[in-house]
Each structure stands twice: as C-alpha cells, then as structure tokens.
Amino acid sequence: MNRLAVEIPGLSLKNPIMPASGCFGFGQEYSKYYDLNELGAIMAKAVTPEPRLGNPTPRVAETASGMLNAIGLQNPGLEHVLAHELPFLEQFETPIIANVAGATEDDYVQVCARIGESKAVKAIELNISCPNVKHGGIAFGTDPDVAHRLTKAVKNVATVPVYVKLSPNVADIVSIAQAIEAAGADGLTMINTLLGMRIDLKTRKPIIANGTGGLSGPAIKPVAIRMIHQVREVSNIPIIGMGGVQTVDDVLEFLIAGADAVAVGTMNFTDPFICPKLISELPKRMDELGISSLQELKKERTNQ
C-alpha cells in the first residue's frame, strides 16, 4: 500500500501535495526543472470564457511573511487553453484540477461545460472569490445563497467532480461551506487569499495599482488552519487545504486539522522545487511522528 496515497472524488493522488492555482501556470515552466509526475495533482491557472489581460501594474507587492497580488485573472481564454495548454499536460499521469473563474454565472457554466473535454482534467476548482458583476460586484463566495446557486448550476453541466474554492473574506465560513455542500459540491478547496493593502510612504498611495490585493503566504496559515478545522467539525466533505504552506510540518498540520490533501502556493515563487521537496520529506517526518499512513491519520482524525 502507498502510505501517501489519497482518494477523493475524481482524484487518485499518489501523494497529498500539489501546486496551487495561479502559482504554477499550466506547468510548462516548472516541467523544465522536475518531472511533473512526482506531484499528487496540479491545480492549473484560472480559465475564463474569453482572454483577459488582467489588472494594471504594479500588481504584486511583497509583505512581511507573504505577498499581495491583484493579477486580475490574466489568462488566454477557454479556447486557447483547450487547444494549447491542456494538451501539454496530457502527457503526464498527474491529474489536473482546472480552475474556473467568471464574472457571471453563465461564464462559469460555459467553461465548466467544456473544460472536461481534456482527458487530463479530472476535476474542476470553482473560484468563487470573483466579483459578481450582475450583483454590484459582490464576490460569489460571500453569500451562501449565491454560492449555492452557482455550485448547483455548474454541477448540472460539469463532466468531472467539482471542488469549490472558499473565500476567507466572510463572517461565517461554515455557513458558506454547508450551502455549497448542499448544492452537490464534490469537495472544497480552502482558503483563497485574504484581502489586504500596502501603502507607499513616498507617494502616500497603495503600492498595488488596483488598491487592494490578495494576501498569501505564511502570514495566512493560522487563518487557513482555523477555517479548515471549523468546516471539518461539521462536515465530512473532502477538503484540499492551502494557505501559507512552507514546510512538511505545515503539510501535516493541515492534514490533522481536517484537509485530505494540501496545495502549495506562494512558496513556488521562492523555491520552484518546493513541492517535490515536501513530497520527499513527508515519509521521514511521518515516521518520526508515528504516522503509519495518511489513511490511518484520517481514521484517527475521524475517531476523535
């Protein structure tokens, strides 16, 4: 038995570690550094129906223990991704999780209905942190009813399992998670970035041209752990955890809190080899902590 293996809807993972969406592109650059078959899965960059240029620069800023970004979902659009990006990933055994974004419910439905045409795509990650342009720009993921309706609409057309990425910028993460699970989601990914800002002391203006950006990196890990634990207390839905993972101990902390697998985001920019490093270090650390397998760790968590 593979002690690192994880089985969740649509995904047979050889290990629980994967790069998070937005920090790995579509994998081509990283494939020059290591074999992508080492990874448990790959969360690909967000896709929208039409190409997007993204936000004006500067759109990235370093912070203490993290970074801010306001990329604005820059991507080449659905048709280009299906024709040029996903075919490259089909040569690997590693399952691909396609991240889908949009400005309207119809945008999500359009992409989710077709993204599964690629044989590499084994699941969808629904980015519901996007502003809903038909409802005053409020993010889809901040209202349980809106999140429920969007999830249901996507489930009606998707040909692969659907994981919904939760925004931490809410008062009650549990009610959002429960609404999404009730709509038929196959799993959750959590958490997305926290809204933040940095000010340039000389210009007296925000460093990010957009004003605000998403805070990621080690600074948000305690928030991610807390939210995953809260959701796991009330639900058995599969969870892919993320938010500030740097070390193998971070990986195990997420798994003990309630995640079934773990995604690494910002650290890919600091160390492009971070995912294979964590994968190679995990068995030894499990031995040191008396963890025979991730399957046993999950049983232990369930019985508490």
From Swiss-Prot:
Q: Which UniProt keywords apply?
A: Cytoplasm, Flavoprotein, FMN, NAD, Oxidoreductase, Pyrimidine biosynthesis
- State its location(s): Cytoplasm
CC annotations in GO: cytoplasm
Q: Which residues bind FMN?
A: 21, 45-46, 99, 127, 165, 191, 217, 243-244, 265-266
Q: What is its EC number?
A: 1.3.1.14
GO BP term (any one): 'de novo' pyrimidine nucleobase biosynthetic process
This chain is encoded by the gene named pyrD
| Gene3D superfamilies to which the protein is assigned, alphabetical | Aldolase class I
> InterPro entries per the record?
Aldolase_TIM (IPR013785), DHO_dehydrogenase (IPR050074), DHOD_1B (IPR033888), Dihydroorotate_DH_1 (IPR024920), Dihydroorotate_DH_1_2 (IPR012135), Dihydroorotate_DH_cat (IPR005720), Dihydroorotate_DH_CS (IPR001295), Dihydroorotate_DH_I (IPR049622)
Its organism's taxonomic lineage begins at: Bacteria, Bacillati, Bacillota, Bacilli, Bacillales
| UniProt protein name | Dihydroorotate dehydrogenase B (NAD(+)), catalytic subunit
**Record's HAMAP family?**
DHO_dh_type1
Family under the similarity heading: Belongs to the dihydroorotate dehydrogenase family. Type 1 subfamily.
Q: Where does substrate bind?
A: 45, 69-73, 127, 192-193
